[in-house]
């Protein structure tokens, strides 16, 4: 598209920087049998939505999961073949937003809890985190690493609505 900052299509499961979008985890949960997938969406920072219904979706390779919002269970959901939307994701359509944390506990086919993920409401932006996909580089002038920049609150929670542009200056001349 010609819309800044997009320089390509807004479609696909991975963006131009190789960062997975939410839909990526749907495919991973179905196709990747070796790595565990437990992905919650949306984020849980919604100022002004307090008390409003905010559906929660989970992509997982486990058959069942339970949603907790600030410790209150919203029940277990299991994948089923009644429709395409129920086959590949778990949904809590009646979840009500309140700041705090959402936790998902995933269960295997025997009903045993096998995975857990927590997403917390972010506070005010505090600092940036730089995360590299590699720990070492070959000093040959050709090797590279991808650095992901995250704006986080004082507790390290991602601030999803912070849209400030961050500029970097490299002092290394090759």
Regions found by a protein language model. Name each.
Residues 1-113:
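Extended substrate-binding grooves/exosites of carbohydrate-active enzymes
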Residues 122-138:
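Low-complexity, acidic Ser/Thr/Pro/Gly-rich terminal tails and inter-domain linkers that flank the onset
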Residues 163-170:
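Short acidic, flexible loop segments centered on an aromatic residue
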Residues 172-174:
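Conserved small/polar residues in nucleotide/adenosyl-binding loops
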Residues 112-122:
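Edge beta-strands of extracellular beta-sandwich domains
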Residues 56-60, 105, 142-160:
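Beta-strand-rich structural segments
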